[in-house]
């Protein structure tokens, strides 16, 4: 009955005080001290950000036709196969692997005249530590100069066979009463006739062209057929002033009378 309640100052230590198993005040003050050069240790090997940057290594491999390159990784084996005219670039971690077919190098050597030993071997054991998610494959398609020239010649031959040349005979055209123009071909545009040469220029690739059974170079555009009953029409006379009747003059409209008062 006569006991007094305990004052707040007589309570136990607050909840943020020292707890069993926790650090004491002395240890807490030690942690708040600035870290010295000894405490600034290098990051662990598991942290890739702390490791110093290593210069990327680039290697080149030349593959023969019908061969493939096998690169052993941690879990799987990476097999690289190339198209005849393509360059493959593979990034394995800090290493870059460039795979080039031998056909492409041989065509480049023939065009430039350079001679070099590009078939040096490559030790792929350096890629054993590369991770599977670090593998990046890029493929580039290349074409040699002889193939491009052959494609251009084939395209020109196709264009020549699709659009045959049509030449006109000036003597036959003038005798039939047509336009005696042996150096012009009429175009559908408004500029007028297109002037062109009347003689065929020698083409070095004419021997390789296929024969043209439908069109012939001796075909005359405006020459009439003798056995045909169709003959060219005479020129039409120009209409005189009496051919078109004159319209009666109408009085000007209301708007014209308001704008232009006489």
Swiss-Prot record:
InterPro entries: PRR23
Basic residues bias (residue ranges): 253-262
Coiled-coil features, chain-numbered ranges: none
Lineage: superkingdom: Eukaryota
Region (Disordered): 1-52, 225-262
Biased composition (Basic and acidic residues): 243-252
Pfam families the UniProt entry points to: DUF2476
UniProt record similarity statement: Belongs to the PRR23 family.
PANTHER family in alphabetical order: PROLINE-RICH PROTEIN 23B, PROLINE-RICH PROTEIN 23C
Protein name as catalogued: Proline-rich protein 23C
Gene: PRR23C
């Amino acid at each position: 009955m006569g006991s007094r309640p305990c004052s707040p100052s007589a309570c136990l230590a607050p909840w943020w005080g020292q707890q069993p198993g926790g650090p004491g005040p002395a240890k807490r003050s030690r942690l708040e001290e600035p870290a010295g050069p000894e405490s600034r240790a290098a990051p662990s090997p598991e942290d890739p950000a702390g490791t110093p940057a290593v210069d990327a290594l680039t290697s080149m491999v030349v593959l023969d036709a019908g061969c493939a390159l096998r690169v052993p990784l941690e879990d799987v084996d990476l097999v690289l196969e190339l198209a005849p005219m393509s360059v493959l670039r593979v990034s394995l971690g800090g290493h870059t692997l460039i795979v080039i077919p031998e056909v492409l190098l041989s065509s480049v050597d023939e065009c430039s005249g350079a001679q070099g030993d590009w078939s040096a071997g490559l030790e792929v054991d350096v890629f054993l530590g590369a991770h599977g998610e670090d593998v990046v494959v890029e493929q580039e398609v290349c074409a040699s100069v002889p193939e491009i020239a052959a494609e251009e010649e084939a395209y020109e031959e196709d264009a020549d066979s699709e659009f045959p040349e049509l030449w006109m005979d000036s003597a036959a055209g003038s005798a039939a009463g047509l336009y005696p123009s042996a150096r012009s071909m009429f175009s559908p545009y408004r500029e007028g006739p297109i002037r062109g040469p009347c003689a065929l220029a020698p083409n070095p690739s004419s021997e390789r062209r296929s024969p043209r059974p439908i069109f012939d170079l001796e075909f005359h555009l405006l020459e009439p057929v003798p056995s045909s009953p169709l003959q060219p029409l005479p020129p039409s006379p120009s209409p005189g002033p009496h051919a078109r009747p004159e319209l009666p003059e109408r009085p000007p409209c209301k708007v014209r009378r308001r704008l232009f008062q006489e």
